Amino acid sequence: MTLYDENNLHIIKDNLRYLKLLSKQYPSISSASSEIINLQAILNLPKGTEHFISDVHGEYESFTHMLKNASGVIKRKIDDVFGTSLRECDKKNLATLIYYPEQKLDLIKKSEKNLEDWYKITLYRLIRLCQIVSSKYTRSKVRKSLPSDFAYIIEELLNEQGDRVDKQEYYNSIIETIIDIDRASEFIIAISNVIQRLVVDKLHIIGDIYDRGPGAEIIIEALSKHHSIDIQWGNHDIVWMGAAAGCEACIANVIRISLRYANLSTLEDGYGINLLPLATFAMDFYKEDNCENFKPRTIDKNLNETDIKLLSKMHKAISIIQFKLEGKIIKRRPEFKMGERLLLDKINIKEGTLNLNEKIYKLIDTNFPTLDKENPYELNERERDLVEKLTNSFINSEKLQRHIKFLYSNGNLYLKYNSNLLYHGCIPLNEDGSLKEVTLCKETLKGKSLLDKLDRLAREAYFFKKDPESKLYGMDMMWYLWCGSNSPLFGKKKMTTFERYFLDDKNTHKEQKNPYYKYRNDEKMCTMIFEEFELDADNSHIINGHIPVKTKEGENPIKANGKLLVIDGGFCKAYQPQTGIAGYTLIYNSYGLLLTSHEPFSSIHKAIVEGNDILSSTTILEHVSSRKRVLDTDSGEEIKKQIHDLEMLLVAYRKGLIKEENEANIRF
């Protein structure tokens, strides 16, 4: 560390106004010096553990468990601390207790014969484990993570060595008192939650919290309580964000997908969206239509025939409305270059055919009661009224708006963090592997500048309420991010929703991926992207989601010699037969990178009652001989800047450029 001297006085004088503001926080040489010492000490602590999860798709049970077990980190800590001194069944029970303390305690109280003895043994084990997981943090940081009820006691226990003779009696008496006053259960719950919190320093969610699963709102509610989180938006997130902003095409897509998978719990129970007007509309216009191609795809859902018929009619009704609303955007925004997706005007109702790319296809469904062949993209009066009601329902859902604001305040299209580049989908490329240029708002953009612009437009869609023109363009862009040909979130040439519903020919259903996916194994492509985002290619990784890794077919999630890692979480049950597993997560700790593959999760109930954990296997991707420290991280760089500023303040005090506060004034 080099302190400023007289040769640097001009720099100090240039920053004098800022330093005077800083002196309000550190009003003396003593306080500034103490802070420098504290910050320097933090730089030498081990780097905190980062946990990367992607593509949750609303599967809240699997996600909740993954969050609680930190992709096996807690289990590994138990192994490290207790080794062979505990039986495997005891380790498993201890892990389950930490994951689900309230529920597990209820079971133990019913089955344990000597509860006081069990409390004593368990408290010792939990305190020992908590001492280890808290050892890489400052006391101040640990203190902030402690529940107020037990903060003092936990801090005392964490910082005392129970095996020292002079402290053993003190240590034991605290534990015995906790049991004697009947607070053992509450203490176990508190310290288990502290372990869960401290075991992961930073959580990264790489997109697609929303989709077909039944509990996206439960997931976001849990994430909003997490101590340190960032989110890289996925295509399914962006369509919900667009819906919350009031984009009618996004609203139609969100409802259609929910009906397609018979998942109305998030819409109706989670967010209070009233779908009764849609049900009424569907029964009026599609009463005699069996809507065969719109029957919901269900997994583990018991629906009766009446429910299926109603959902099918609602599904078809909102799909036709969606195609009309999308057509309006395509016509309004020729720069999107999506004219080939205008299909309603290519329907010949009389012949029952579709003219697609100058080829005639037979439609498998020819009932279009709301389609005006002269103005196929116009909503009829009933449709317009319905769309207005649905839009009002989305805009006025307090919980939905709160959750979407959380996604905005904690999310981005991409993130650079500790030399890693995180994004959900892709960086749009040309066929030759070069960055694809896209024209938006009369600007030609590519790579980082494209993503930065799209990020800003996504925010304008939601926040520019007093600028209708900018808000409308932003909302249209939200829809484009969902399904546009150059969207970094979608990553395909087109979304063939219409063809899948109305054409039998499977060739028309194909969705061509962006060339990015062809080059994912190419180190040169990764190097190009690192340079574009101003990252060191030798020490960086791209961490990617979106496309499930087909492990059963031999696909490897480690691409480009370890430069690119695909961690599609595989939470979505529909993908698991294709992938063969329940996907991957990533851990980045002070020792290196660990990629963990997971088997499908049974249920939270089985995890609590039977101790069933997610079966996982871990691959060490990188291992460093010398542990990474805070010094080596982004937060370390920020701390170094703080030290630099405090050093300038010290010189300013010592040179008399700023006067120290009187000690008496500081105290009082």
From Swiss-Prot:
InterPro entries: FBPtase_class3, Metallo-depent_PP-like. It is an enzyme of class 3 (hydrolase). GO terms for molecular function: fructose 1,6-bisphosphate 1-phosphatase activity. Pathway: Carbohydrate biosynthesis; gluconeogenesis. It holds the Pfam family FBPase_2. Disulfide bonds: none annotated. GO terms for biological process: gluconeogenesis. Keywords: Carbohydrate metabolism, Hydrolase, Manganese. It catalyses: beta-D-fructose 1,6-bisphosphate + H2O = beta-D-fructose 6-phosphate + phosphate. It comes from the Bacteria. Its cofactor is Mn(2+). Its EC number is 3.1.3.11. Belongs to the FBPase class 3 family. This is Fructose-1,6-bisphosphatase class 3.
